């Protein structure tokens, strides 16, 4: 395996594939923090040239974390479809890129072949794509999943209604929930991040969600994003629950820092299929985000895009209903500004869809990042073109509990209006029955949450 190239009379030599992958990555402050990034733009180009000639077999044989040491690697490798892999193992990363972008290659073709790709292959081809490549390629791929309703259908754009509250006050949560529903948010999930991470608090909020859902016959899913073990305990104690949530990482060490293992998720899935309130079969919800592994020193000298791709490979094993990157949540230490956040959002969405998971995006930023609401709206617009399954919906885009900025109720509504997309069909019909939508457009009643009081 020759890992060197000469550009303009200068020879660049790379130590191993891991270094090639890291230095081929677009500029990210997280990679600089980890001392993995290319030192110059010229070195980045050289790494991309070398990576383009690497074969998929070489990438499979050199996972970011050794098979013997890491259950994430083992799940990714063991789940691989061998006939598909054998067909393409001699391809270079450049060959894979050209095949994906070829106008004759369909979304169905990509979905079929993706079962033969490891996460390192997915990350590698992502690094050779420009932003428009990522949009064009992702838009080809359609990934659906079913919980109570089906997300990801052609012509739909969904929204997670996130009615977070600083004290978990049920009435405050309800006010945000009703307002969001009246704007057409919530078809992906009614999902709250609780202040108090306990089974008792999760159960209390889940019961309020279920009460509202049943009273108005709302076709959607409910979830409280406490720790997976707290949610499991709540379900075991009889709380209604459609989805169990967990933040995930791209290494076993990262997941252990989050307080769980693959076995925990297997148990959570089995519990939901036995005692959950959803139809299924997709009953899990995962969130990711570039750089989380570095925070727990669980990145194994691997760049943040490659580790993020491994999150999606890990997620695929559990057939989740929802997966989304929380793209700018960690802050400027890992994604410095709007340009880096935009790039990361497009990368994550493409890698998730290429891996085969139902992919959304929390287009967001922290208040100490060089980004603003316009930048996040730009990213949401680009991801809508890329066929993103869902965004977040928070009152005015300002999460007063988590202290970060994201998309509000109006953004998804506006993007649906611009593109002619709708909510999930059953939810769209509910909006029409309630008078919030007429002939595909929001009515004057939209935004009036008081109309849902009872």
Residue ranges of predicted features:
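Anaerobic metallocofactor- and corrinoid-dependent redox/one-carbon enzyme cores
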Residues: 1-174, 182, 189-454
